Amino acid sequence: MATLRISSALIYQNTLTHHFRLRRPHRFVCKSMTKTTPDTTLVELSRRSGNYQPSPWNHCYLLSIENKYASETEVITRDVLKKKVKSMLDDEKKSRLEQLELIDDLQKLGVSYHFEIEINDTLTDLHLKMGRNCWKCDKEEDLHATSLEFRLLRQHGFDVSENIFDVIIDQIESNTFKTNNINGIISLYEASYLSTKSDTKLHKVIRPFATEQIRKFVDDEDTKNIEVREKAYHALEMPYHWRMRRLDTRWYIDAYEKKHDMNLVLIEFAKIDFNIVQAAHQEDLKYVSRWWKDTCLTNQLPFVRDRIVENYFWTVGLIYEPQFGYIRRIMTIVNALVTTIDDIYDIYGTLEELELFTSMVENWDVNRLGELPEYMRLCFLILYNEINGIGCDILKYKKIDVIPYLKKSWADLCRTYLVEAKWYKRGYKPSLEEYMQNAWISISAPTILIHFYCVFSDQISVQNLETLSQHRQHIVRCSATVLRLANDLGTSPTELARGDVLKSVQCYMHETGASEERARDHVHQMISDMWDDMNSETKTACNSSSRSRGFKEAAMNLARMSQCMYQYGDGHGCPEKAKTIDRVQSLLVDPIPLDVNRLG
Protein backbone atom coordinates (compact mmCIF):
# COMPACT_ATOMS: atom_id res chain seq x y z
CA MET A 1 0.00 0.00 0.00
CA ALA A 2 3.04 2.30 -0.11
CA THR A 3 1.91 3.85 -3.38
CA LEU A 4 -1.50 4.73 -2.00
CA ARG A 5 -0.52 5.93 1.44
CA ILE A 6 3.02 6.91 2.25
CA SER A 7 4.02 6.18 5.83
CA SER A 8 3.87 9.02 8.32
CA ALA A 9 7.55 8.69 9.17
CA LEU A 10 8.56 9.20 5.56
CA ILE A 11 6.23 12.17 5.20
CA TYR A 12 7.61 13.79 8.33
CA GLN A 13 11.15 13.50 7.03
CA ASN A 14 10.44 14.58 3.48
CA THR A 15 7.44 16.89 3.66
CA LEU A 16 8.97 19.41 1.30
CA THR A 17 10.65 17.16 -1.21
CA HIS A 18 8.20 14.31 -1.75
CA HIS A 19 5.97 14.42 -4.81
CA PHE A 20 3.17 11.91 -5.18
CA ARG A 21 3.11 10.12 -8.51
CA LEU A 22 -0.44 9.06 -9.15
CA ARG A 23 -0.29 6.44 -11.85
CA ARG A 24 -3.30 6.23 -14.07
CA PRO A 25 -4.34 3.71 -16.70
CA HIS A 26 -4.47 4.67 -20.34
CA ARG A 27 -7.09 7.35 -20.88
CA PHE A 28 -9.94 6.71 -23.27
CA VAL A 29 -10.10 9.41 -25.92
CA CYS A 30 -13.24 9.37 -28.01
CA LYS A 31 -12.73 10.27 -31.66
CA SER A 32 -15.73 12.57 -31.52
CA MET A 33 -13.72 14.77 -29.15
CA THR A 34 -11.00 15.35 -31.70
CA LYS A 35 -13.16 17.18 -34.16
CA THR A 36 -15.82 19.82 -33.96
CA THR A 37 -19.24 18.22 -33.72
CA PRO A 38 -22.15 20.63 -33.65
CA ASP A 39 -25.07 20.03 -31.32
CA THR A 40 -27.98 18.38 -33.06
CA THR A 41 -30.44 21.03 -31.97
CA LEU A 42 -30.70 24.19 -34.05
CA VAL A 43 -33.00 25.93 -31.61
CA GLU A 44 -31.49 28.78 -29.60
CA LEU A 45 -32.00 27.80 -25.96
CA SER A 46 -32.27 30.18 -23.05
CA ARG A 47 -29.66 29.14 -20.50
CA ARG A 48 -29.54 30.22 -16.87
CA SER A 49 -26.46 31.59 -15.16
CA GLY A 50 -25.33 31.09 -11.59
CA ASN A 51 -23.56 34.47 -11.76
CA TYR A 52 -20.56 32.95 -10.03
CA GLN A 53 -17.45 35.08 -9.77
CA PRO A 54 -14.13 33.85 -11.20
CA SER A 55 -11.82 32.03 -8.82
CA PRO A 56 -10.04 34.41 -6.46
CA TRP A 57 -7.00 32.13 -6.70
CA ASN A 58 -4.69 32.42 -9.70
CA HIS A 59 -3.07 29.16 -10.83
CA CYS A 60 0.41 30.71 -11.11
CA TYR A 61 0.03 32.19 -7.64
CA LEU A 62 -0.90 28.80 -6.20
CA LEU A 63 2.22 27.26 -7.73
CA SER A 64 4.35 29.96 -6.12
CA ILE A 65 3.25 29.57 -2.49
CA GLU A 66 5.62 27.97 -0.02
CA ASN A 67 6.22 27.87 3.71
CA LYS A 68 9.67 29.19 4.53
CA TYR A 69 9.36 27.92 8.10
CA ALA A 70 9.19 24.24 7.12
CA SER A 71 12.75 23.44 6.17
CA GLU A 72 14.73 20.37 7.19
CA THR A 73 15.99 22.32 10.21
CA GLU A 74 12.44 22.87 11.45
CA VAL A 75 11.63 19.18 10.95
CA ILE A 76 14.60 18.24 13.15
CA THR A 77 13.57 20.79 15.79
CA ARG A 78 9.99 19.54 15.69
CA ASP A 79 11.12 15.95 16.29
CA VAL A 80 13.21 17.02 19.30
CA LEU A 81 10.23 18.87 20.76
CA LYS A 82 8.00 15.88 20.03
CA LYS A 83 10.12 13.74 22.38
CA LYS A 84 9.73 16.35 25.11
CA VAL A 85 5.96 16.42 24.67
CA LYS A 86 5.84 12.62 24.79
CA SER A 87 7.65 12.71 28.12
CA MET A 88 4.89 15.02 29.41
CA LEU A 89 2.29 12.43 28.43
CA ASP A 90 4.31 9.67 30.10
CA ASP A 91 4.70 11.61 33.36
CA GLU A 92 2.91 9.51 35.98
CA LYS A 93 3.06 12.34 38.54
CA LYS A 94 0.51 14.40 36.65
CA SER A 95 -2.88 14.77 38.27
CA ARG A 96 -6.06 13.64 36.54
CA LEU A 97 -6.88 17.24 35.55
CA GLU A 98 -3.34 17.87 34.26
CA GLN A 99 -3.55 14.76 32.09
CA LEU A 100 -6.92 15.79 30.68
CA GLU A 101 -5.84 19.36 29.96
CA LEU A 102 -2.69 18.17 28.21
CA ILE A 103 -4.68 15.83 25.96
CA ASP A 104 -7.17 18.61 25.23
CA ASP A 105 -4.37 21.04 24.37
CA LEU A 106 -2.65 18.52 22.09
CA GLN A 107 -5.92 17.92 20.29
CA LYS A 108 -6.81 21.58 19.88
CA LEU A 109 -3.25 22.50 18.86
CA GLY A 110 -3.51 19.96 16.03
CA VAL A 111 -0.68 17.68 17.14
CA SER A 112 -2.55 14.82 18.83
CA TYR A 113 -2.06 12.65 15.72
CA HIS A 114 1.57 12.19 16.84
CA PHE A 115 0.46 10.59 20.12
CA GLU A 116 -2.64 8.53 19.36
CA ILE A 117 -1.40 5.43 21.22
CA GLU A 118 -0.32 7.38 24.32
CA ILE A 119 -3.57 9.36 24.42
CA ASN A 120 -5.70 6.24 24.04
CA ASP A 121 -3.76 4.48 26.82
CA THR A 122 -4.23 7.44 29.16
CA LEU A 123 -7.95 7.73 28.44
CA THR A 124 -8.41 3.97 28.83
CA ASP A 125 -6.79 4.17 32.26
CA LEU A 126 -8.96 7.14 33.27
CA HIS A 127 -12.09 5.36 32.06
CA LEU A 128 -11.25 2.27 34.12
CA LYS A 129 -10.67 4.41 37.21
CA MET A 130 -13.97 6.19 36.63
CA GLY A 131 -15.77 2.84 36.45
CA ARG A 132 -14.17 1.54 39.65
CA ASN A 133 -14.78 4.69 41.68
CA CYS A 134 -18.31 5.33 40.34
CA TRP A 135 -17.83 8.93 41.39
CA LYS A 136 -19.96 11.90 40.45
CA CYS A 137 -19.23 15.59 40.08
CA ASP A 138 -20.45 17.21 43.31
CA LYS A 139 -17.93 20.00 43.90
CA GLU A 140 -17.32 23.24 42.06
CA GLU A 141 -13.64 22.42 41.57
CA ASP A 142 -14.65 19.12 39.94
CA LEU A 143 -16.85 20.82 37.34
CA HIS A 144 -14.13 21.58 34.79
CA ALA A 145 -12.33 18.25 35.22
CA THR A 146 -15.50 16.15 35.05
CA SER A 147 -16.87 18.00 32.04
CA LEU A 148 -13.57 17.78 30.21
CA GLU A 149 -13.19 14.08 31.01
CA PHE A 150 -16.74 13.36 29.83
CA ARG A 151 -16.13 15.17 26.53
CA LEU A 152 -12.76 13.58 25.81
CA LEU A 153 -13.88 10.07 26.72
CA ARG A 154 -17.03 10.25 24.61
CA GLN A 155 -15.15 11.82 21.74
CA HIS A 156 -12.71 8.90 21.74
CA GLY A 157 -15.46 6.29 21.81
CA PHE A 158 -15.68 5.44 25.52
CA ASP A 159 -19.15 4.85 26.94
CA VAL A 160 -19.75 7.38 29.73
CA SER A 161 -23.13 8.06 31.34
CA GLU A 162 -24.62 11.52 31.76
CA ASN A 163 -25.39 10.43 35.33
CA ILE A 164 -22.01 11.74 36.46
CA PHE A 165 -23.65 15.18 36.33
CA ASP A 166 -26.66 14.17 38.48
CA VAL A 167 -25.66 16.27 41.51
CA ILE A 168 -25.13 19.37 39.39
CA ILE A 169 -28.37 18.75 37.48
CA ASP A 170 -30.29 18.54 40.77
CA GLN A 171 -28.73 21.83 41.88
CA ILE A 172 -29.57 23.52 38.57
CA GLU A 173 -33.17 22.32 38.71
CA SER A 174 -33.53 23.51 42.33
CA ASN A 175 -31.81 26.84 41.60
CA THR A 176 -29.14 26.11 44.20
CA PHE A 177 -26.19 25.79 41.83
CA LYS A 178 -23.83 28.72 42.40
CA THR A 179 -20.42 29.18 40.79
CA ASN A 180 -18.11 31.87 39.50
CA ASN A 181 -16.04 29.25 37.66
CA ILE A 182 -16.74 30.34 34.07
CA ASN A 183 -14.10 27.94 32.72
CA GLY A 184 -16.01 25.11 34.35
CA ILE A 185 -19.27 26.35 32.82
CA ILE A 186 -17.68 26.54 29.36
CA SER A 187 -16.40 22.97 29.79
CA LEU A 188 -19.88 21.87 30.86
CA TYR A 189 -21.35 23.58 27.79
CA GLU A 190 -18.87 21.88 25.46
CA ALA A 191 -19.52 18.50 27.08
CA SER A 192 -23.26 18.84 26.44
CA TYR A 193 -22.66 18.68 22.68
CA LEU A 194 -21.44 15.08 22.99
CA SER A 195 -25.02 14.13 23.84
CA THR A 196 -27.10 11.37 22.32
CA LYS A 197 -30.90 11.29 22.05
CA SER A 198 -31.12 9.34 25.30
CA ASP A 199 -29.21 12.05 27.20
CA THR A 200 -32.30 14.09 28.05
CA LYS A 201 -30.68 15.91 30.98
CA LEU A 202 -27.78 17.11 28.87
CA HIS A 203 -30.32 18.48 26.38
CA LYS A 204 -32.97 19.92 28.63
CA VAL A 205 -31.00 21.04 31.68
CA ILE A 206 -27.26 21.37 31.21
CA ARG A 207 -27.01 22.90 27.73
CA PRO A 208 -29.63 25.66 28.26
CA PHE A 209 -28.21 26.48 31.70
CA ALA A 210 -24.59 26.62 30.53
CA THR A 211 -25.52 28.67 27.45
CA GLU A 212 -27.38 31.21 29.58
CA GLN A 213 -24.49 31.52 32.04
CA ILE A 214 -21.93 32.06 29.28
CA ARG A 215 -24.10 34.70 27.63
CA LYS A 216 -24.40 36.55 30.92
CA PHE A 217 -20.63 36.43 31.27
CA VAL A 218 -19.88 37.86 27.82
CA ASP A 219 -22.59 40.51 28.18
CA ASP A 220 -21.21 41.69 31.53
CA GLU A 221 -19.40 44.95 30.85
CA ASP A 222 -17.40 44.50 34.05
CA THR A 223 -15.74 41.33 32.76
CA LYS A 224 -11.99 42.00 32.80
CA ASN A 225 -10.53 38.66 31.72
CA ILE A 226 -10.12 39.14 27.95
CA GLU A 227 -8.64 35.65 27.48
CA VAL A 228 -11.65 33.87 28.99
CA ARG A 229 -14.08 36.26 27.31
CA GLU A 230 -12.69 35.37 23.86
CA LYS A 231 -12.95 31.69 24.77
CA ALA A 232 -16.59 32.18 25.78
CA TYR A 233 -17.46 34.07 22.57
CA HIS A 234 -15.81 31.33 20.54
CA ALA A 235 -17.81 28.62 22.29
CA LEU A 236 -21.13 30.42 21.82
CA GLU A 237 -20.46 30.99 18.14
CA MET A 238 -20.13 27.24 17.59
CA PRO A 239 -19.32 24.39 20.01
CA TYR A 240 -15.93 22.76 19.63
CA HIS A 241 -17.45 19.38 18.72
CA TRP A 242 -19.04 20.91 15.60
CA ARG A 243 -16.01 22.89 14.43
CA MET A 244 -13.67 22.14 11.54
CA ARG A 245 -10.64 20.80 13.38
CA ARG A 246 -7.85 22.35 11.35
CA LEU A 247 -9.36 25.83 11.27
CA ASP A 248 -9.91 25.70 15.01
CA THR A 249 -6.29 24.66 15.44
CA ARG A 250 -5.18 27.88 13.77
CA TRP A 251 -7.39 29.87 16.14
CA TYR A 252 -6.30 27.92 19.22
CA ILE A 253 -2.58 28.33 18.54
CA ASP A 254 -3.03 32.09 18.83
CA ALA A 255 -5.35 31.75 21.83
CA TYR A 256 -3.05 29.31 23.65
CA GLU A 257 -0.03 31.57 23.19
CA LYS A 258 -1.89 34.31 25.10
CA LYS A 259 -2.58 32.08 28.11
CA HIS A 260 -0.76 33.06 31.28
CA ASP A 261 0.16 29.42 31.95
CA MET A 262 1.01 28.34 28.41
CA ASN A 263 3.77 25.76 27.97
CA LEU A 264 6.59 27.09 25.77
CA VAL A 265 7.61 23.65 24.48
CA LEU A 266 4.03 22.85 23.55
CA ILE A 267 3.34 26.09 21.68
CA GLU A 268 6.58 25.98 19.70
CA PHE A 269 6.01 22.34 18.83
CA ALA A 270 2.50 23.17 17.61
CA LYS A 271 3.62 26.15 15.52
CA ILE A 272 6.46 24.28 13.82
CA ASP A 273 4.24 21.28 13.17
CA PHE A 274 1.51 23.51 11.73
CA ASN A 275 3.98 24.91 9.21
CA ILE A 276 5.29 21.48 8.25
CA VAL A 277 1.76 20.17 7.72
CA GLN A 278 0.87 23.33 5.79
CA ALA A 279 3.81 22.69 3.46
CA ALA A 280 2.39 19.22 2.72
CA HIS A 281 -1.01 20.79 2.04
CA GLN A 282 0.58 23.31 -0.31
CA GLU A 283 2.09 20.51 -2.38
CA ASP A 284 -1.33 18.85 -2.56
CA LEU A 285 -2.88 22.12 -3.65
CA LYS A 286 -0.34 22.61 -6.42
CA TYR A 287 -1.03 19.11 -7.70
CA VAL A 288 -4.81 19.52 -7.85
CA SER A 289 -4.49 22.99 -9.36
CA ARG A 290 -2.42 21.54 -12.21
CA TRP A 291 -4.95 18.74 -12.64
CA TRP A 292 -7.86 21.18 -12.75
CA LYS A 293 -6.12 23.43 -15.26
CA ASP A 294 -5.32 20.44 -17.46
CA THR A 295 -8.98 19.36 -17.59
CA CYS A 296 -9.90 22.61 -19.40
CA LEU A 297 -13.35 22.36 -17.81
CA THR A 298 -13.52 26.03 -16.89
CA ASN A 299 -12.72 26.98 -20.48
CA GLN A 300 -15.17 24.51 -22.00
CA LEU A 301 -17.91 25.10 -19.40
CA PRO A 302 -17.66 28.76 -18.36
CA PHE A 303 -20.91 28.56 -16.35
CA VAL A 304 -19.49 26.16 -13.73
CA ARG A 305 -17.90 27.25 -10.47
CA ASP A 306 -14.12 27.50 -10.75
CA ARG A 307 -13.46 26.38 -7.17
CA ILE A 308 -10.52 24.00 -7.07
CA VAL A 309 -9.05 25.68 -3.98
CA GLU A 310 -12.35 25.50 -2.14
CA ASN A 311 -12.74 21.87 -3.20
CA TYR A 312 -9.32 21.15 -1.72
CA PHE A 313 -10.25 23.08 1.44
CA TRP A 314 -13.10 20.60 1.99
CA THR A 315 -10.60 17.73 2.03
CA VAL A 316 -8.43 19.40 4.67
CA GLY A 317 -11.54 19.44 6.83
CA LEU A 318 -12.12 15.79 6.01
CA ILE A 319 -8.63 14.52 6.87
CA TYR A 320 -5.74 16.93 7.49
CA GLU A 321 -2.88 14.72 8.68
CA PRO A 322 0.16 14.99 6.37
CA GLN A 323 0.43 11.27 5.61
CA PHE A 324 -2.94 11.30 3.82
CA GLY A 325 -1.97 13.49 0.88
CA TYR A 326 -3.04 10.89 -1.69
CA ILE A 327 -6.51 10.78 -0.15
CA ARG A 328 -6.84 14.57 -0.18
CA ARG A 329 -5.82 14.73 -3.83
CA ILE A 330 -8.27 12.04 -4.91
CA MET A 331 -11.09 13.54 -2.84
CA THR A 332 -10.43 16.99 -4.33
CA ILE A 333 -10.86 15.51 -7.80
CA VAL A 334 -14.13 13.91 -6.66
CA ASN A 335 -15.30 17.21 -5.17
CA ALA A 336 -14.43 19.13 -8.34
CA LEU A 337 -16.40 16.68 -10.48
CA VAL A 338 -19.37 16.91 -8.10
CA THR A 339 -19.30 20.71 -8.33
CA THR A 340 -19.10 20.66 -12.13
CA ILE A 341 -21.90 18.14 -12.63
CA ASP A 342 -24.06 19.87 -10.03
CA ASP A 343 -23.82 23.11 -12.03
CA ILE A 344 -24.75 21.34 -15.25
CA TYR A 345 -27.95 20.05 -13.63
CA ASP A 346 -28.65 23.09 -11.49
CA ILE A 347 -28.04 25.86 -14.01
CA TYR A 348 -27.37 24.98 -17.60
CA GLY A 349 -28.89 21.74 -18.87
CA THR A 350 -32.32 21.24 -20.36
CA LEU A 351 -34.38 18.34 -19.05
CA GLU A 352 -33.78 16.37 -22.24
CA GLU A 353 -30.02 16.91 -21.99
CA LEU A 354 -29.98 16.00 -18.30
CA GLU A 355 -31.89 12.79 -18.94
CA LEU A 356 -29.30 11.87 -21.58
CA PHE A 357 -26.42 12.59 -19.19
CA THR A 358 -28.08 10.60 -16.39
CA SER A 359 -28.55 7.64 -18.74
CA MET A 360 -24.91 7.89 -19.83
CA VAL A 361 -23.68 7.75 -16.23
CA GLU A 362 -26.01 4.85 -15.43
CA ASN A 363 -24.76 2.84 -18.41
CA TRP A 364 -21.12 3.92 -18.02
CA ASP A 365 -20.62 3.42 -21.74
CA VAL A 366 -18.08 5.79 -23.25
CA ASN A 367 -18.81 4.50 -26.75
CA ARG A 368 -22.12 6.38 -26.61
CA LEU A 369 -20.39 9.70 -25.99
CA GLY A 370 -21.61 11.12 -29.29
CA GLU A 371 -25.20 10.95 -28.04
CA LEU A 372 -24.49 13.74 -25.56
CA PRO A 373 -24.62 17.46 -26.34
CA GLU A 374 -21.14 18.69 -27.11
CA TYR A 375 -20.73 20.66 -23.88
CA MET A 376 -21.38 17.52 -21.79
CA ARG A 377 -18.89 15.23 -23.52
CA LEU A 378 -15.70 16.48 -21.95
CA CYS A 379 -17.25 16.41 -18.48
CA PHE A 380 -18.42 12.80 -18.86
CA LEU A 381 -15.10 11.68 -20.34
CA ILE A 382 -13.14 13.18 -17.44
CA LEU A 383 -15.54 11.59 -14.95
CA TYR A 384 -15.21 8.23 -16.72
CA ASN A 385 -11.41 8.36 -16.83
CA GLU A 386 -10.89 9.60 -13.27
CA ILE A 387 -13.25 7.14 -11.58
CA ASN A 388 -11.89 4.23 -13.61
CA GLY A 389 -8.38 5.40 -12.72
CA ILE A 390 -9.17 5.46 -9.01
CA GLY A 391 -10.72 2.01 -9.31
CA CYS A 392 -7.69 0.74 -11.22
CA ASP A 393 -5.31 1.92 -8.47
CA ILE A 394 -7.44 0.22 -5.82
CA LEU A 395 -7.61 -3.02 -7.82
CA LYS A 396 -3.82 -3.05 -8.20
CA TYR A 397 -2.97 -2.38 -4.58
CA LYS A 398 -5.98 -3.63 -2.62
CA LYS A 399 -7.06 -6.51 -4.88
CA ILE A 400 -10.73 -5.56 -5.14
CA ASP A 401 -12.79 -4.09 -7.97
CA VAL A 402 -14.71 -1.10 -6.57
CA ILE A 403 -15.62 0.51 -9.92
CA PRO A 404 -19.19 -0.93 -9.93
CA TYR A 405 -19.81 0.68 -6.53
CA LEU A 406 -18.20 3.99 -7.45
CA LYS A 407 -20.08 4.35 -10.72
CA LYS A 408 -23.36 3.45 -8.96
CA SER A 409 -22.76 6.29 -6.52
CA TRP A 410 -22.46 8.71 -9.45
CA ALA A 411 -25.59 7.31 -11.08
CA ASP A 412 -27.51 7.70 -7.81
CA LEU A 413 -26.25 11.26 -7.50
CA CYS A 414 -27.24 12.19 -11.04
CA ARG A 415 -30.69 10.68 -10.58
CA THR A 416 -31.31 12.90 -7.55
CA TYR A 417 -30.00 15.92 -9.47
CA LEU A 418 -32.49 15.05 -12.21
CA VAL A 419 -35.37 14.86 -9.72
CA GLU A 420 -34.57 18.37 -8.48
CA ALA A 421 -34.25 19.66 -12.05
CA LYS A 422 -37.72 18.27 -12.83
CA TRP A 423 -39.15 19.87 -9.69
CA TYR A 424 -37.73 23.22 -10.72
CA LYS A 425 -38.75 23.04 -14.39
CA ARG A 426 -42.29 21.98 -13.45
CA GLY A 427 -42.74 24.33 -10.49
CA TYR A 428 -43.31 21.46 -8.07
CA LYS A 429 -43.14 22.18 -4.33
CA PRO A 430 -42.27 19.05 -2.32
CA SER A 431 -43.01 18.52 1.36
CA LEU A 432 -40.01 18.71 3.68
CA GLU A 433 -39.97 14.91 4.05
CA GLU A 434 -40.12 14.35 0.29
CA TYR A 435 -37.43 16.96 -0.26
CA MET A 436 -35.10 15.41 2.32
CA GLN A 437 -35.55 11.87 0.96
CA ASN A 438 -33.93 13.09 -2.24
CA ALA A 439 -31.75 15.92 -0.92
CA TRP A 440 -29.59 13.94 1.50
CA ILE A 441 -28.27 12.06 -1.53
CA SER A 442 -28.19 15.03 -3.93
CA ILE A 443 -25.89 16.91 -1.55
CA SER A 444 -23.24 14.34 -2.64
CA ALA A 445 -22.10 13.12 0.80
CA PRO A 446 -22.83 9.43 0.03
CA THR A 447 -20.79 9.74 -3.18
CA ILE A 448 -17.95 11.47 -1.37
CA LEU A 449 -17.84 9.03 1.53
CA ILE A 450 -17.87 5.83 -0.53
CA HIS A 451 -14.86 7.17 -2.46
CA PHE A 452 -13.22 8.10 0.84
CA TYR A 453 -13.84 4.61 2.21
CA CYS A 454 -12.23 3.00 -0.84
CA VAL A 455 -9.05 5.09 -0.77
CA PHE A 456 -8.77 5.20 3.05
CA SER A 457 -9.37 1.60 4.07
CA ASP A 458 -6.51 -0.89 4.05
CA GLN A 459 -8.94 -3.82 3.94
CA ILE A 460 -12.04 -3.04 1.89
CA SER A 461 -15.06 -5.09 2.91
CA VAL A 462 -17.62 -6.10 0.29
CA GLN A 463 -20.23 -5.95 3.04
CA ASN A 464 -19.31 -2.34 3.80
CA LEU A 465 -19.34 -1.49 0.10
CA GLU A 466 -22.83 -2.96 -0.18
CA THR A 467 -24.19 -1.03 2.81
CA LEU A 468 -22.62 2.19 1.54
CA SER A 469 -23.84 1.60 -1.99
CA GLN A 470 -27.38 0.86 -0.80
CA HIS A 471 -27.39 3.91 1.53
CA ARG A 472 -27.74 1.82 4.69
CA GLN A 473 -24.93 3.37 6.75
CA HIS A 474 -26.71 5.56 9.28
CA ILE A 475 -23.72 7.76 10.06
CA VAL A 476 -23.43 8.59 6.35
CA ARG A 477 -27.07 9.61 6.26
CA CYS A 478 -26.62 11.77 9.37
CA SER A 479 -23.52 13.46 7.96
CA ALA A 480 -25.26 14.00 4.63
CA THR A 481 -28.29 15.50 6.34
CA VAL A 482 -26.15 17.99 8.26
CA LEU A 483 -24.35 18.89 5.04
CA ARG A 484 -27.65 19.35 3.21
CA LEU A 485 -29.23 21.47 5.93
CA ALA A 486 -26.12 23.61 6.49
CA ASN A 487 -25.93 24.14 2.73
CA ASP A 488 -29.60 25.14 2.62
CA LEU A 489 -29.20 27.63 5.46
CA GLY A 490 -26.19 29.22 3.78
CA THR A 491 -27.17 29.17 0.11
CA SER A 492 -30.97 29.21 -0.20
CA PRO A 493 -31.39 33.03 -0.42
CA THR A 494 -29.00 33.25 -3.39
CA GLU A 495 -30.34 30.13 -5.09
CA LEU A 496 -33.97 31.16 -4.69
CA ALA A 497 -33.16 34.57 -6.15
CA ARG A 498 -32.03 32.89 -9.36
CA GLY A 499 -35.08 30.60 -9.36
CA ASP A 500 -33.92 27.27 -7.90
CA VAL A 501 -36.08 24.55 -6.38
CA LEU A 502 -37.30 25.18 -2.83
CA LYS A 503 -34.83 24.26 -0.07
CA SER A 504 -35.56 22.78 3.36
CA VAL A 505 -36.39 26.15 4.95
CA GLN A 506 -38.87 27.06 2.23
CA CYS A 507 -40.35 23.54 2.13
CA TYR A 508 -41.10 23.79 5.85
CA MET A 509 -42.56 27.28 5.45
CA HIS A 510 -44.75 26.17 2.53
CA GLU A 511 -45.90 23.03 4.33
CA THR A 512 -46.64 24.53 7.77
CA GLY A 513 -47.17 28.24 7.15
CA ALA A 514 -44.32 29.02 9.54
CA SER A 515 -42.29 32.22 9.39
CA GLU A 516 -38.79 32.07 7.94
CA GLU A 517 -37.30 32.57 11.41
CA ARG A 518 -39.27 29.66 12.82
CA ALA A 519 -38.41 27.51 9.80
CA ARG A 520 -34.70 28.22 10.20
CA ASP A 521 -34.93 27.36 13.91
CA HIS A 522 -36.55 24.05 12.92
CA VAL A 523 -33.70 23.30 10.51
CA HIS A 524 -31.13 24.13 13.20
CA GLN A 525 -32.88 21.66 15.51
CA MET A 526 -32.76 19.02 12.77
CA ILE A 527 -28.98 19.56 12.58
CA SER A 528 -28.67 19.15 16.35
CA ASP A 529 -30.70 15.92 16.19
CA MET A 530 -28.39 14.53 13.52
CA TRP A 531 -25.38 15.27 15.74
CA ASP A 532 -27.04 13.29 18.53
CA ASP A 533 -27.39 10.35 16.15
CA MET A 534 -23.75 10.62 15.03
CA ASN A 535 -22.65 10.75 18.66
CA SER A 536 -24.59 7.53 19.25
CA GLU A 537 -22.77 5.91 16.33
CA THR A 538 -19.37 6.70 17.88
CA LYS A 539 -20.25 6.26 21.56
CA THR A 540 -18.51 2.87 21.79
CA ALA A 541 -16.09 3.32 18.89
CA CYS A 542 -13.06 2.53 21.08
CA ASN A 543 -13.93 -1.14 20.54
CA SER A 544 -13.73 -0.76 16.74
CA SER A 545 -10.69 -0.98 14.46
CA SER A 546 -8.70 2.20 13.84
CA ARG A 547 -9.87 2.26 10.21
CA SER A 548 -13.51 1.90 11.21
CA ARG A 549 -13.08 4.76 13.68
CA GLY A 550 -11.29 6.75 10.99
CA PHE A 551 -14.19 6.39 8.57
CA LYS A 552 -16.73 7.46 11.19
CA GLU A 553 -14.54 10.42 12.10
CA ALA A 554 -14.36 11.40 8.42
CA ALA A 555 -18.16 11.30 8.19
CA MET A 556 -18.38 13.60 11.19
CA ASN A 557 -15.64 15.80 9.76
CA LEU A 558 -17.68 16.23 6.59
CA ALA A 559 -20.54 17.51 8.74
CA ARG A 560 -18.13 19.80 10.59
CA MET A 561 -16.75 21.09 7.31
CA SER A 562 -20.23 21.89 6.04
CA GLN A 563 -20.99 24.00 9.09
CA CYS A 564 -17.71 25.81 8.52
CA MET A 565 -18.24 26.37 4.79
CA TYR A 566 -21.79 27.67 5.14
CA GLN A 567 -21.42 29.42 8.51
CA TYR A 568 -21.51 32.91 6.97
CA GLY A 569 -23.27 32.19 3.68
CA ASP A 570 -22.29 30.28 0.56
CA GLY A 571 -18.62 29.76 1.31
CA HIS A 572 -18.22 27.38 -1.63
CA GLY A 573 -19.97 29.24 -4.43
CA CYS A 574 -19.30 32.79 -3.18
CA PRO A 575 -16.10 32.51 -1.11
CA GLU A 576 -15.51 36.26 -1.31
CA LYS A 577 -18.67 36.87 0.74
CA ALA A 578 -18.43 34.16 3.38
CA LYS A 579 -14.91 34.37 4.89
CA THR A 580 -13.64 31.39 2.90
CA ILE A 581 -10.83 33.39 1.30
CA ASP A 582 -9.51 34.52 4.69
CA ARG A 583 -9.80 31.00 6.07
CA VAL A 584 -7.96 29.44 3.14
CA GLN A 585 -5.29 32.12 3.42
CA SER A 586 -4.72 31.38 7.10
CA LEU A 587 -4.66 27.59 6.69
CA LEU A 588 -3.01 27.00 3.33
CA VAL A 589 -1.02 30.11 2.45
CA ASP A 590 0.20 32.11 5.45
CA PRO A 591 2.75 30.35 7.69
CA ILE A 592 3.00 30.97 11.41
CA PRO A 593 6.15 33.06 11.97
CA LEU A 594 8.69 31.46 14.29
CA ASP A 595 11.03 33.06 16.81
CA VAL A 596 14.20 31.03 16.35
CA ASN A 597 15.64 32.32 19.64
CA ARG A 598 12.57 31.64 21.76
CA LEU A 599 13.59 28.19 22.98
CA GLY A 600 17.08 29.32 23.82
Swiss-Prot record:
Identify the species of origin.
Arabidopsis thaliana (Mouse-ear cress)
Organelle transit peptide: 1-31
Q: What is known of its domains?
A: The Asp-Asp-Xaa-Xaa-Asp/Glu (DDXXD/E) motif is important for the catalytic activity, presumably through binding to Mg(2+).
The protein depicted here goes by the name 1,8-cineole synthase 2, chloroplastic
Cofactors (names): Mg(2+); Mn(2+)
Q: Which gene encodes it?
A: TPS23
Q: Where does Mg(2+) 1 bind?
A: 342, 346
Induction conditions: Not induces in aerial parts by treatments with jasmonic acid, 6-ethyl indanoyl-L-Ile, fungal peptaibol elicitor alamethicin or herbivory.
UniProt-listed GO biological process terms: diterpenoid biosynthetic process
Tissue-level expression reads:
Predominantly expressed in roots and at much lower levels in siliques. Not found in leaves, flowers or stems. Also detected in flowers in cv. Landsberg erecta. Not expressed in root apical meristem and elongation zone. Found in the vascular system of young roots and additionally in the cortex and epidermal cell layer of older roots.
